Each structure stands twice: as C-alpha cells, then as structure tokens.
UniProtKB/Swiss-Prot annotation:
It comes from Mycobacterium tuberculosis (strain ATCC 25618 / H37Rv). Signal peptide: none annotated. It is an enzyme of class 2 (transferase). It catalyses: Transfers a segment of a (1->4)-alpha-D-glucan chain to a primary hydroxy group in a similar glucan chain. This is Probable 1,4-alpha-glucan branching enzyme Rv3031.
Length: 526
C-alpha cells in the first residue's frame, strides 16, 4: 500500500445495494427464508456493527447505502425477527456439535481434510464464539427491527440512504402507472420507517429506459445509479440526464471488479473461507478456498490467521487501486475525478466471509492514505458533475441491456407480468370508481390494497433474473405464478361481485404477504 498520506485529487464513493425478494412465509430451505436468515446473520448483522463502530470513531459520510423497501420490510417484520433469532440459536447449536466431535462420522464430507474430527473441533470452537457474539448483538440491538439501527446511522451522518420502488420491479418493462406508484410509495416507505425520504435511488438492476429521468424528477429523486457501460465507460463524473437536473452516477468497473467480478476478485483468494464446501452433518463451512480449481474433497481447513493476513494485503491493494484510479482519471479529464465502487451488500459476509472485516479496515485506510471518501450527495454538492448525457436502454445484467429480464428464456414471465398488471389496474379502477360513487369520503379498500401487493410481488425483477441465470429457477417461476394466481383470484371474485369472498381471499393472502402496511390503492395514479 502507498503509505504516503499526501492527498490525491477527487472523491471516492462506496455504494452498497441491499436487496432480497420477499421470502417470509414462502419456503424455508434451500431457497426461501433460509436465504434471508443467512444473509441477515452473515452480512446485515456485521455490516451494521462495522458502521456503528466507525460512527463511534466520529467518521462521517462513509458509504452510500441502498436499502430496498422489501428488505426493510423483512428486517422490521416480527415473524422474520423471530425466525432469524431461532436461526442464530440453531447456528450456535450446530457450532457446539462441531466443537464436540470426537470421531469420524458417516457423511459425504467425512473424508474431507476440513472435516476431520480435529479440524471440525478447532473450527467449531471459533464458530461457537462467532454465533454467541451474533446472538448477543441481535438480542441487544435488533429486537425492535433494523429501522432504529439504520435511522441512527443516517442521523449520525455515517451513511447516505438510497431508496427504491416497492418490491424491486424491473422498471423499464412496468406499466407507467404502476411504475410511478411503486417508486413514490417506496420513497414514502423509507420516510415512515427511517424518518428520511431518500433523494437518491438504486434503480432495480440499474435498469434505465429513456424518459425515466423525468419520472425521477417528478418523484423528487435527484440522483440514481447506473452501470459503467451506460455512460460508455466514462464514470469519472456524474452526468445530468436529458433535460433534467437528475444526475446519473456510474459504477467504475475497473475498481469494482478488483473486489468482485464474475471471474475474479478478492473473495476467491486461497486463504478465505470457501462458500461452497460444507460439513454435511452440521451444515457449517469449515474449509478455505485453497485454490480455484481444488475440489471440495481436497480443500484445506480454514485458518483465520492466514485469512486475516490476506485481508490486510487486499486492503492495501484496494487503497493503491483507488489512489491510482483517482490520479489517472483526474489527469484524463483535467479536473478532480469521482470514482465509485458499487456492490451488492450481501457480498460482504454472506458470499465473502471476511468481507465486513475488509470493509472496516479499508474505510479507515483510505482517508489515512490521502483519499477523500464521501457519498453521492457529496459528489453533487462539491461539483463532481459533468455535461448532460442521453442514456441508452441499459442495466447491469449480462450484456448490459434488458435481455436477462426480457429475453426469450423469460418471455412467458414478461407476458404473465403484463396480463397480471392489466387485470389488477382494471379491477382496482372499477372497485374504486364504484366506491367513489357513494356519498362521503373515499374509504380505504383493503381488497384493492392486497391486489396491488400481490401484483408488485409478481413483477419483482428477482424472478426473471433467477430463471435467466438458472439459479433456483423452479422456485422463481413458482413465486411469480403464485402471486399472479393470488392477484387473479382476488380480482376475479371482486369482478364477479362476490365482495365478501374477495375480502376473505385478500385477508388470507395478506397473512403471508402483508408487507407494506401503509400501501393504499387510493394513491394509485389515474
């Protein structure tokens, strides 16, 4: 690492995007609530602990943190809070089992070097300590949900909050009325939970269609994230889009890919904990990566001291990468440049066990090495904005276009979404019109509200992504069709004049899909 504290020109911003689909009440393992609880325990708990520690050091404007409304809903949901508490306790039990192994047991992993009795005992002792700390952290800080913790970090100026639309839809393919509603209500949801209405958003999948900047301006959004290629790779400054003042910021792929890319990055280092190798009796992950082409049955036991040394190496490397990039980009454009590294939050801890430790150290090391760290709002306030630009239709998916969400592999889901949205909007319009014809103020319609909830869950961008990537594709199709069925079932009863049946159906579906309690169909744009 360049140990010189001489300042370099420009500004560095770290952006994290926190998102999972609505998983509560929809399966447990291997995809479902287990996915939520693993991410919560491995990423969300340590991330907020890291940020709180840095805030206690009087460090400000450290990261720009995107929190989707659907994740916030789960982090505050009593059912989910109870579920993750049980998950953490079960983790501790599994760690205690590993710590007490005395002889080789019959399992698929029994002959792995990382799963010998000696290796498991040593690993289990450390894992017990980790689980105990996580349980204590949860019990003392999280029992009232994630929002109080997030609000404290926002109030302290440690993070800038990015919001987004309800349920994470792929906005370019969404009917304009529902797109406007989802964004406006998503920003309002953040205001209700966190007492902050975000000025910036992480657009789901960094997806953009020409003209969306006008919608953003109308909703009070001042800036949003796109992927680097959307700006033709020139991400050194934010760019106002079209004829608006809404600024698009692009991810610097050269810097971001240093940490994580489809084929390389720090988490694949031989010393780090291997994500894919399990002890098949306890479900714990006791191996290190060892080598990129080393099979699980040959991976060495995890060595935390070796991993810790690798973290320091990668902190130093990243600091040098950021310094050099700021210097070269500032020289190229003839003024101080802005460099943005952006990642999914779940990378840090869930996919990369050592990620939170790396994050804490790098956020201390960058300022010490003369790098100014700030948020996207800081970039706008301090003039890191260039000339207006016209953006192409784009995303951060494969090909940097829309194919992951609109290609032949998911054509049936695109058609399903279109039909369900049409059904929902038509049904809600008729229901509200009938109620409006009565005397007095328009009452809230909980049946129409639930139709909107199920519709928004149907059009979540996660389902076509999972199908296109063949990642739990059957589960993704099941979820899309389940919520489509719920929408059609309630709407069908309502359209047939069976109001009591529609109400019972809506109440039933709400027991599983009761997120966004403030959602109100009366606010749907005309």
């Amino acid at each position: 690492m360049n140990t010189s504290a001489s300042p370099v020109p420009g500004l560095f911003t770290l952006v994290l995007h926190t998102h999972l689909p609505w998983l509560a009440h929809h399966g447990r393992w291997p995809v479902g609530e287990e996915w939520l609880y693993q991410s919560w325990a491995a990423a969300y708990l340590p991330l907020l602990q890291v940020l709180a520690a840095l805030a206690d050091e009087n460090r400000h404007r450290l990261i720009t943190l995107g929190m989707t409304p659907v994740v916030n809903a789960q982090l505050d949901d009593p059912y989910c809070l109870n579920g993750v508490h049980h998950w953490l306790a079960n983790w501790q039990l599994r760690a205690e089992e590993a710590a007490s192994v005395r002889y080789a047991r019959q399992s698929k992993s029994a002959d792995y070097p990382s799963c010998t009795p000696e290796a498991l005992r040593a690993f289990g002792i450390r894992e017990c300590a980790d689980a105990a700390r996580a349980l204590d952290n949860f019990a003392t800080r999280w029992r009232h949900g994630g929002s109080p913790l997030l609000r404290g970090l926002i109030d302290a100026g440690t993070v800038e909050l990015l919001g987004g639309p309800l349920a994470h839809p792929f906005q370019p393919l969404l009917a304009p009325r529902l797109r406007e509603f989802a964004l406006r209500e998503g920003l309002a949801d953040a205001q209700l939970r966190l007492a902050h209405r975000p000025k910036g958003i992480w657009a789901p999948e960094c997806a953009y269609a020409p003209g969306m900047e006008v919608d953003y301006a109308t909703a009070g959004v001042s800036h949003f994230m796109v992927d680097g290629p959307s700006l033709h790779g020139d991400t050194a400054l934010g760019r106002p889009v079209g004829k608006t003042d809404v600024v698009a910021f692009g991810r610097d792929l050269q810097v971001s890919y240093r940490v994580w890319s489809p084929k390389s990055g720090y988490p694949g280092h031989a010393a780090y904990r291997d994500f894919h190798t399990y002890d098949h009796l306890t479900g714990l992950k006791p191996a290190r990566v060892t080598g990129r082409n080393v099979p699980s049955e040959q991976k060495a036991p995890y060595d935390p001291e070796r991993a810790d040394r690798a973290v320091d190496v990668h902190v130093a490397d990243f600091v040098d990468v950021v310094r050099n990039r700021l210097l070269s980009e500032s020289e190229r454009i003839g003024r101080p440049a802005h460099v943005i590294a952006a990642f999914d939050t779940e990378l840090f801890g869930h996919w990369w066990y050592e990620g939170p430790t790396w994050l804490q150290r790098v956020l201390r090391a960058l300022p010490a090495a003369g790098v100014r760290v700030g948020t996207l709002s800081d970039a706008i306030a301090d003039g890191f904005v260039g000339d207006p630009v016209e953006l192409p239709p784009s995303s951060w998916g494969s090909g940097k276009d829309w194919q992951v969400w609109s290609g032949a592999k998911v054509a049936d889901l695109v058609q399903l979404n279109s039909e369900v949205v049409d059904t929902a909007l038509t049904t809600i319009d008729k229901a509200l019109a009938q109620t409006a014809s009565l005397d007095g103020p328009l009452p809230r319609d909980h049946v129409a509200d639930q139709i909107l909830r199920e519709t928004l869950l149907t059009v979540s961008s996660d389902w076509p992504f999972m199908v296109s990537k063949d990642s739990a594709a059957d589960y993704a199709r099941y979820r899309a069709h389940l919520h489509a069925h719920a929408t059609r079932e309630i709407a069908g009863a309502l359209a047939a004049g069976r109001r009591d049946t529609a109400r019972r159906l809506a109440e039933g579906w709400n027991r599983a899909d009761g997120l966004f309690g403030a959602l109100d169909a009366r606010r749907l744009p005309k």
